[in-house]
Amino acid sequence: MATDPSQYKFNHSMLRVKDPKRSVQFYEFLGMKLINKLANPDAKFDLYFLAYDSPKAVSHGNHWTDREGIVELTHNYGTEDDPDYKIANGNTDPRGFGHLAISVDNIQAACQRLEDSGYKFQKKLTDGKMRHIAFVLDPDSYWVEVIGQKTLEETESVKETDTASYRLNHTMIRVKDAEVSLNFYKDVMGMQLKRTSENEKNGFNLYFLGYGAPTPEASANGANPLAGSEGLLELTWNYGTEKDPNFKYHDGNAEPQGFGHICIAVDDLEAACARFEEKKVNWKKRLTDGRMKNIAFVLDPDGYWIEVVQNEKLKARSNW
């Protein structure tokens, strides 16, 4: 069977966490549901998969491999009791991973709810010049951006927020060379460039990529046209990094650890990996390597890990 990249899904983003109880509680407070847990007591780690799953959710009721917008939390046993164990969130040196982002119905009310519950903010809505976004901190100080599905003016007097309408909108990573990374994610991974935001004054550009139908560049009410989506990858490029031969971003898997990988679910795992081989990708783990024959890992141009798994709805392969 051939493989069709238009059938791929940006399935999840993996973060290591110190204390899974606290972290699961936080993401559940954001409206997510624990849709799967893979316990690995022999190897002393557990995996928690959280996603939006209300009747209003994009992937309501779907198998975990047939979704976009999942957060995978990895817990290595014992870290919760180690006073010296600390996660690297990617936003202090060494930098790399930037943030997750949720889109919400009424951003002012959503941020107030988070603040009222005692969660800390890296940036409140009212801080700085950018009054349309906020960043809340999860229990390990990973940044979670909060963006609105409507304009600020539409929601400024609304006091309620419905977490069932939220989306896990995107995952942001920093890249050294925008042209190289865009070519990789489009040509090799089969994503489409859905939106570009150029910030010449501040010396950086943002690129939003994803699978599925093309998205319009503008919306009628001026809100972000991608805010209702899930499964977007945001690449942040700071001008000039591509010219520095010694410049390198941190992949999150070397020490100090934090972010682990992004994952795509494909229509046919063997055929997809054969196509990646033809594209001459750098492998972290081929499908046939090691004991786990149901996952592969590709390296992107910055060395970030991309897990590849079978979408079990399209072809049953593993009993996850």
Q: Where in this protein do the model-derived segments appear?
A:
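Short mixed-charge
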Residues: K56-R67, T215-A227
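Short, polar loop/linker segments at the starts of domains and inter-domain junctions
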Residues: P83-T92, P245-N253
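Short, low-complexity disordered segments enriched in Ser/Pro/Gly and basic
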Residues: D4-Y8, W64-R67, N91-F97, T161-R167, ...
